[in-house]
């Protein structure tokens, strides 16, 4: 006897054959200051409040020293144990350094919260949390959920393989001249050759030519400083300053030439030439008024015109 086949109609059965995904429990990380490790009653109360299977306890001093590491993207809530009355707040926040945030933030899931037991963090303590990438929320800080960026392809218009057939151009009957238009065989450069060049100076009136050149504001001299022209000056200030410098140098050279004296103009003291006197005119006053090379150096003062004789290197007044 041949076996009979049995068919099952799934539409008549209220059975769900889809596989259900296990719901992952939310994990909590407790960050405690070192002083709480010596109080067993505090630790017993903590684990009576939080489920031990989904809660981890780490010491802040060990995190700050880099002794322990945290698993990445694991915790939904990070709670800093500062006591409800804030007894251990200063101790905990003092250990909540940048090194702790560097280890803590990667271990938080997207949307995870960072909170304290007593109250929210103040502005100075919250600065490190903001720098670590956390966003301030109602009861603390939250790790933002940044979705990964996706590349969007850009579609450009491609050339069509099958080009459309060009439409036939109607032929011009013989005897008619083609109008001078866009399709005229005359090129643009032929038209440019017929244009006359205009002298730009003719566009300026007499008033424009006599109008003084106003330098731009950036060329105006600052208080107590000399005007300086720009590197690519076009307002004429560079030429004007150069002309002033040339005139100043010419005047200085002219004055220098006036001050030059020839050998015959030197009015130095010379005993071989009659009528010559000392250029300082103070030879008779004393050593305090005489020049460095005065031959009367060391002699007492005498009256101008008084005869002085030197015998055996001794002055005779």
Swiss-Prot record:
Its cofactor is [2Fe-2S] cluster; [4Fe-4S] cluster. Residues 22-152 are annotated as: N-terminal SAM-like domain. Transmembrane segments: none annotated. InterPro entries: Anamorsin, CIAPIN1, Dre2_N. Residues 219-235 are annotated as: Fe-S binding site A. One of its GO terms (molecular function) is electron transfer activity. One of its GO terms (cellular component) is mitochondrial intermembrane space. Pfam families: CIAPIN1, DRE2_N. Residues 153-209 are annotated as: Linker. Residues 280-294 are annotated as: Fe-S binding site B. It comes from the Eukaryota. GO terms for biological process: iron-sulfur cluster assembly. [4Fe-4S] cluster binds at residues 280, 283, 291, 294. A motif (Cx2C motif 1) lies at residues 280-283. A motif (Cx2C motif 2) lies at residues 291-294. HAMAP family: Anamorsin. PANTHER family: ANAMORSIN (PTHR13273:SF14). The C-terminal domain binds 2 Fe-S clusters but is otherwise mostly in an intrinsically disordered conformation. Belongs to the anamorsin family. Monomer. Interacts with tah18. Interacts with mia40. This is Fe-S cluster assembly protein dre2. It comes from Penicillium rubens (strain ATCC 28089 / DSM 1075 / NRRL 1951 / Wisconsin 54-1255).
């Amino acid at each position: 006897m041949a076996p009979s086949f049995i068919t099952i109609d799934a539409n008549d059965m209220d059975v769900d054959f889809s596989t259900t995904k296990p719901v992952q429990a939310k994990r909590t990380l407790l960050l405690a200051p070192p002083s709480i490790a010596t109080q067993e009653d505090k630790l017993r109360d903590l684990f009576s409040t939080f489920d031990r299977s989904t809660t981890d306890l780490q010491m802040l001093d060990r995190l700050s020293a880099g002794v322990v590491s945290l698993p990445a993207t694991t915790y939904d809530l990070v709670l800093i144990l500062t006591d409800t009355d804030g007894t251990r707040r200063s101790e905990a926040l003092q250990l909540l350094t940048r090194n702790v945030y560097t280890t803590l933030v990667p271990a938080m899931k997207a949307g995870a919260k960072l909170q304290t037991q007593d109250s929210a963090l103040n502005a100075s303590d919250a600065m490190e949390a903001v720098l670590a990438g956390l966003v301030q929320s109602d009861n603390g800080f939250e790790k933002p959920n940044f979705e990964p960026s996706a590349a969007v392809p850009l579609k450009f218009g491609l050339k069509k393989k099958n080009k459309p057939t060009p439409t036939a151009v109607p032929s011009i009957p013989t005897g008619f001249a083609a109008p001078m238009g866009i399709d005229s065989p005359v090129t643009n450069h032929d038209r440019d050759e017929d244009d006359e060049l205009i002298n730009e100076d003719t566009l300026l009136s007499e008033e424009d030519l006599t109008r003084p050149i106003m330098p731009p504001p950036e060329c105006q001299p600052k208080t107590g400083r000399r005007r300086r022209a720009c590197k690519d000056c076009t307002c004429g200030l560079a030429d004007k300053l150069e002309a002033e410098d040339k005139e100043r140098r010419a005047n200085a050279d002219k004055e220098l030439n006036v001050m030059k004296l020839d050998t015959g103009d030197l009015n130095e003291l010379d005993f071989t030439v009659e009528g010559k006197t000392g250029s300082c005119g103070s030879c008779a006053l004393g050593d305090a008024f005489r020049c460095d090379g005065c031959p009367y150096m060391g002699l007492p003062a005498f009256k101008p015109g008084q005869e002085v004789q030197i015998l055996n290197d001794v002055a005779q007044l």
